[in-house]
Regions:
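Cationic, low-complexity basic patches in intrinsically disordered or flexible, solvent-exposed regions
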Residues: 3, 19-21
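Basic polycationic patches enriched in arginine
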Residues: 15-16
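Extended C-terminal regions of large enzymes
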Residues: 22, 184-219, 225-657
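Protein-protein interaction/assembly regions in multi-subunit complexes
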Residues: 22-222, 227-301, 582
Length: 657
């Protein structure tokens, strides 16, 4: 097949007969009435050859893994052998949605991206909100599989059910807002997920940005897209799913919105979003400060959206995701040293305020907002960026580098972001990630786990978080972790899903392995259903609200699958074990479940003064966690896989080796 033989704008020819075959398959799937709410297929685009086909999903995969993360991981374990380099053409990247995307259910305006991570070297996943996920959920497909590497920059459009590849030469080098504007002009009504210059330049922690300010961040998938010469994906849907019970779904949607808009905790959260939570962690003495050397930041009053007068002057409103009345995404407008801060890029979330603020000793809120804007424009993960810069500041303080980079220097932070994205000067070194930089400098204070920079949560005052950090195959990821401070409310609000019937002391080790497993399974289920963190498990943790009965009702109305509490947790456990199987394939073992040595240093002040992670107690808890999981030192045993109805993976781990 000859490349670039289409029109001026279309790189690869469009093969209609493939879609006719898929339409017959889709009709058959819906006639069988076994699983509604799905299209039963993914776009499968090979950028090396230019061929686009449909990838049909077995019904049993939906029944076992539901969607989102689960289906994406199952595809990759089917199609990859583990030898792939994350930034070479044999890696595969999957954009995936679940049954609820495209239905308008509050909290379901999200999508998943799954691939082999240049940060951890294993399969990993990330999520973003906004409107792209909803559009993909009405596209006629449940996701998009990208293989190979295009000979020239391209983008993929999926408009009215028809996927096509187009030249993207004019878009290469553009920041994400410019890319989005150009694609919306060319394809009216599309939603766009794209990379900026950081992804093009293969920065290890480059991310994917959709809707201008929603980041699919952490594992470095912006660089995976860049390595494939894939600039963007533009989707316009409008294709309705076949629902099990449309009337019931409408009633559940209405009831969920009513509950969200009348819950005082959720309404308050919507006004300030995560940016109003910074002081909470500071009060606990657990706000990452000075590269995690401290847990209290003296400049806290300047960077919390709820307390900072300067922050409030920058705020210009709130934004939402598809179908969600909470509207927790803040917008800012202003300037930093003569540079415009634009509302289109959104306000910094908690993680960004900590990573580029307190952890760098930076209390210049305008500087943080502008740094956040640059990260979104260039397509950089703000957490990894902040952790890497704070490491550099400490290295400078300890005279490990020639450059003088002072703590709290907002201007220097902005300059370093520019250098990282463009891979200029010292930015070329930093672009490789904090683990690489630490090895080059011979430093032992890099804050990462399995190559992934730390999230902005300190396990010295959260025992279950430490277990999760150490054991998750995702690296230093907090998004499925039990946040012990929030768990002190679990008994108050009641959470039968994870077997909690009384208050949990954040500093106690007792039962934390069990809580960690249950909560991780709950979060893993949420990531297969793809429901918002803050309506999902954070609703359980932080607010007087348990959304999971409504989520299960919505899934039944959509799919016809009766998912009780036990099956909900089983779906989560299955999908989490897919991650563990992939990690075992890459050689990860029980020996790799470690935390940075800094967490054995006591916090110097604040409510958590003197707290450390006791290595002996942590290792005992991890042993208990492995026992509860049914894992040996390599991963899930064959007995556990059989219990989870994952018999196709028996023998997947080579225990003889």
């Amino acid at each position: 097949m000859q490349l670039f033989n289409g029109s001026v704008h279309t790189c690869y020819s469009y093969r209609r007969h493939q879609y006719e075959q898929s339409e017959e398959y889709l009709a058959k799937l819906q006639e069988e009435e076994q699983v509604k709410g799905v299209f039963g297929r993914y776009v499968d685009a090979d950028l090396s050859t230019g061929k686009i086909r449909d990838y049909e999903i077995p019904l049993t995969w939906y029944q076992k893994y539901l969607g989102g993360r689960g289906i994406g991981l199952r595809i990759l374990l089917e199609e990859m052998n583990g030898d792939e380099d994350p930034l070479e053409e044999d890696n595969i990247i999957v954009f995936s949605v679940g049954p609820l995307q495209g239905t308008g259910v509050a909290g379901a305006g999200r999508y998943a991206v799954i691939s082999k991570s240049p940060k951890t070297g294993s399969l990993n996943d990330t999520y973003a909100g906004g409107f792209f996920g909803h559009e993909l959920g009405t596209s006629g497909y449940d996701g998009i599989i990208i293989r190979g590497k295009a000979p020239k920059p391209v983008y993929l459009s999926l408009v009215d059910g028809k996927p096509e590849l187009h030249y993207a030469h004019s878009l290469w080098g553009q920041q994400v807002v410019d890319t989005e504007n150009a694609l919306k002009e060319k394809h009216p009504g599309v939603r766009v997920a794209s990379i900026g210059p950081a992804g093009e330049n293969l920065v290890k922690f480059a991310c994917i940005i959709s809707d201008r300010n929603r980041a699919a961040a952490r594992p470095g998938f912006g660089s995976v897209m860049g390595s494939k010469n894939l600039k963007a994906i533009a989707v316009r849907g409008g294709i309705q799913k076949s629902l099990h019970d449309a009337q019931m779904l409408a009633e559940v949607r209405k009831r969920l919105v009513q509950e969200l808009t009348t819950n005082a905790d959720i309404v308050a959260f919507g006004k300030g979003g995560t940016a109003s939570c910074v002081h909470v962690f500071n009060d606990e003495g657990l706000l990452p400060t000075k590269n995690f050397q401290e847990g209290v930041f003296d400049g806290i009053a300047a960077i919390d959206a709820g307390t900072s007068a300067d922050f409030k002057k920058l705020l210009v409103g709130n934004d939402n995701c598809t179908g969600c009345p909470v509207r927790c995404k803040l917008k800012v407008d202003g300037e930093f040293k003569g540079q415009a801060i634009q509302a289109a890029y959104g306000a910094p979330e908690y993680e960004t305020l900590a990573a580029l603020g307190s952890n760098c000793m930076n209390d210049d809120i305008a500087g943080i907002c502008y740094a956040n804007q640059l990260c979104n424009a260039y397509g950089l993960d703000t957490m990894s960026t902040g952790v890497t810069i704070s490491f550099l500041m400490e290295a400078s303080e300890k005279n490990l580098i020639d450059e003088k980079i002072n703590w709290g220097d907002a201007k220097a932070i902005v300059q370093l972001i520019e250098q990282i994205a463009r891979r200029e000067g010292i930015g070329d070194l930093l672009a490789r990630g904090v683990d690489y930089v630490a090895k080059e400098l011979g430093a032992d204070f890099a804050m990462h786990i399995k190559g992934q920079e730390l999230a902005m949560h300190d396990p010295r005052g959260k025992r279950a978080l430490g277990i999760s950090y150490a054991t998750t195959p995702r690296g230093a990821n907090h998004m499925e972790a039990l946040q012990d401070d929030g768990a002190e409310n679990l008994g108050k609000y009641g959470t039968p899903e994870i077997g909690v019937y009384g208050p949990i002391d954040r500093l106690a080790w007792k039962d934390k392995s069990r809580y960690c497993k249950k909560f991780t399974d709950l979060g893993s289920f949420s990531n297969s259903a793809i429901v918002c963190t803050y309506i999902g498990w954070d609703g359980v943790l932080l607010m007087d609200y348990n959304p999971y009965p409504r989520i299960r009702e919505a899934l039944y109305a959509t799919t016809g699958l009766e998912i009780g509490v036990c099956e909900m947790l089983s779906i989560g456990e299955r999908t989490f074990n897919l991650l563990k199987l992939a990690a075992a394939q890459q050689g990860y073992t029980r020996d790799d479940d470690k935390l940075p040595e800094r967490f054995q240093e006591p916090l110097p002040r604040g409510m958590s003064r003197g707290e450390v992670v006791c290595e002996e107690l942590l290792q005992e808890a991890i042993d208990d966690y492995y026992r509860l999981r049914g894992w040996d030192r390599l991963g899930p045993t064959d007995q556990k896989l059989s219990e989870l109805d994952m018999t196709e993976f028996i023998g997947f781990i080579d225990r003889k080796a």
